[in-house]
Structures are given as structure tokens and as C-alpha cells.
């Protein structure tokens, strides 16, 4: 089996966690893999469409082609597998109106043209089913060998609230600015650590700004004491696949999150972390964890057990391989 995997970037989270980390497993099971960035220039596109027939499967991660390119893709590709992990059929949370007919139309066309679709969660799967019944959920996962439980016994004089992500999501965290100020007033030994490529400041709580680096992200996560994942309740957030939470729980952190979409499945309220809907709940739940290190450890260990139950490369890679084999067998 020869498979071409198209990704949006080598450092893009979806590329790393939904494609690149599966390549070694696929290769070890006989799949001849080629990974490439989406073509941009005219020359790259000509070469891309020229090469397509040599592959048994073309695996597209997230990006939707416009109608002319999609027609060419369907003519030249033997089999198409489309993978996505966001509400790409809607506008993001910053938009006044989440509905976009252009996005919806392009998404529908992409789904119709695909032989199989892999969705990152059940909400996304349900967007596919009316158009294409050949769809399964594979959650965004982590490598359980790379993500090890943090050392709870390391002495620390500060409690670290942590958030990891990219510039497109930090606005969710920044909206909690007043909460962080109140937390800082109550707990002088508390800090907020942001691992990202952009940052913001607070006056009453120390903000530790750490530039994200792929080879340091696990160590950064292990330095957190409490993981945060705020969201808003909208169609864009419903499509999120909870990678932050999976990362937090993978290293044994308790999580405080907005109970929206997949967050409700990943965080068991009162067991692996807390749900927080209002500013008062956010402040209260964070405070409870700041004051109770034993509760942090208990919830963190329980969260890791949950992740090991189905959100690892070790459990998801065989499922991806099985899908590729089934797609091969159909044609």
C-alpha cells in the first residue's frame, strides 16, 4: 500500500498529532508512506496532480480544496481519505456569525468526494453522516511513552496554572484575565504559565511566558500543577477535540475546563478535574486545587488513566491502519 499524506505544516499541532506520529507505526506494518505539505505554487500543483495516480490512497488532513481542484483530485486520485479535527464548516469563535455558506459548501463537497472520512470527535462525525456514511471517529491522541506522569514529589514554592496552545486560541484564556487577577490577590505563591507564541500580561499574578517548542512541550506540561482549558459555547468549540486536556492528563495534571463539547467527555467533573461555567466557578475550582496538592495528584493520576484508556497513539494507530486497509479493499 502506497499512501500520500498531505499536511498543513510540520509544526502544526493537527499535523503532528493526527498524521506524523502515526507514520512509524504505518511503516512498520507495510505502508509505504510519503508526507508532504499541500502544494502552493503552479509548479507544485502540476507535479502534485501528475504524481497522484502512483498512490493507492491520498490522505488529506483538514484542508478543503475548491471545486476545480477537487474535481482534478477526484479524477487523479485512486482513493481519498479526509481527516479533520475542527469545525471547519463554521467560522471560528471570534466571528459574529458562526454560519458560513461558503465554508459549509466547500466542506460538503470535500466530504462527498472522499472515500472515507476520519473525524476527531462525535460532533464532527455527525456533520459528515448526512452526506457520507463512511466515517469513523479517531480522537486526537498522545504517545504514552513520550508523555510520562510528572513527579509530584519535586519540591516547589509556587503553584503553576498552565495553558498550552497557539495564537488562534489564546483569546479564550485572555478572557479570564479578571479571574487571574483575583487569584493572584488571594494566592501570592501562584503563577500563570503560558506556552504559546503570543502572550498577555496580568498585574496581580506573575505570568511566565514560554515560547512553544516541540521538543520541550512535555517538559513544560510536567511543570504545570493545574491545566486550564476555557472555551465558549459555540459551533466552533463543539468541534474542538480536546488536545490540551489530553496533553494535561497525559502528564498527570488535574484540569479545569469549560464543559463544552468533548471537554465533557474528557474531564469527569470531580474525578479528573472540574467543570467551570461562570467566573465564580472558575475562581472557586482553581482555588480548591491550589489549596489541595493531594487532590491535584489524585485527579491527575485518574486523568492519566482515562487517557491511557483510548487517547494514545498505541491505541489509535491500529485503528487508522485498519481504516486504510478497508479503504484499499473496497476498490
Map each language-model feature to its residues.
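A short, well-ordered alpha-helix in the C-terminal region of glycosyltransferases
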Residues: 288, 295-310, 316-322
Amino acid at each position: 500500500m502506497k499512501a500520500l499524506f498531505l499536511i498543513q505544516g510540520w509544526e502544526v499541532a493537527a499535523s503532528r498529532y493526527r498524521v506524523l506520529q502515526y507514520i512509524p507505526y504505518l511503516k512498520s506494518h507495510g505502508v509505504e508512506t510519503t508526507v508532504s505539505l499541500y502544494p502552493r505554487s503552479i509548479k507544485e500543483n502540476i507535479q502534485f496532480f501528475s504524481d497522484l495516480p502512483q498512490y493507492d490512497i491520498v490522505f488529506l488532513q483538514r484542508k478543503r480544496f475548491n471545486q476545480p481542484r477537487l474535481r482534478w483530485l477526484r479524477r487523479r486520485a485512486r482513493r481519498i481519505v479526509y481527516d479533520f479535527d475542527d469545525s471547519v464548516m463554521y467560522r471560528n469563535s471570534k466571528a459574529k456569525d458562526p454560519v458560513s455558506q461558503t465554508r459549509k459548501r466547500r466542506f460538503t463537497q470535500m466530504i462527498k468526494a472522499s472515500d472515507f472520512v476520519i473525524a476527531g470527535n462525535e460532533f464532527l462525525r455527525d456533520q459528515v453522516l448526512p452526506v457520507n456514511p463512511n466515517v469513523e471517529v479517531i480522537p486526537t491522541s498522545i504517545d504514552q511513552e513520550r508523555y510520562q506522569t510528572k513527579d509530584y514529589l519535586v519540591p516547589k514554592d509556587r503553584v503553576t496554572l498552565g495553558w498550552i496552545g497557539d495564537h488562534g486560541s489564546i483569546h479564550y484564556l485572555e478572557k479570564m484575565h479578571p479571574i487571574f487577577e483575583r487569584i493572584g490577590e488571594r494566592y501570592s505563591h501562584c503563577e500563570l504559565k503560558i506556552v504559546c507564541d503570543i502572550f498577555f500580561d496580568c498585574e496581580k499574578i506573575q505570568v511566565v511566558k514560554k515560547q512553544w517548542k516541540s521538543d520541550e512541550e512535555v517538559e513544560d506540561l510536567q511543570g504545570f500543577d493545574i491545566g486550564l482549558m476555557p472555551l465558549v459555547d459555540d459551533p466552533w468549540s463543539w468541534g474542538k477535540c480536546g488536545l490540551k486536556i489530553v496533553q494535561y492528563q497525559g502528564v498527570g495534571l488535574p484540569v479545569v475546563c469549560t464543559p463544552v463539547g468533548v471537554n465533557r467527555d474528557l474531564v469527569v467533573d470531580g474525578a479528573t478535574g472540574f467543570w467551570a461555567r461562570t467566573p465564580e466557578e472558575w475562581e472557586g475550582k482553581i482555588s480548591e486545587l491550589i489549596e489541595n496538592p493531594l487532590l491535584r495528584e489524585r485527579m491527575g493520576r485518574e486523568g492519566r488513566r482515562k487517557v491511557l484508556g483510548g487517547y494514545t497513539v498505541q491505541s489509535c494507530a491500529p485503528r487508522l491502519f485498519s481504516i486504510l486497509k478497508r479503504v484499499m479493499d473496497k476498490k
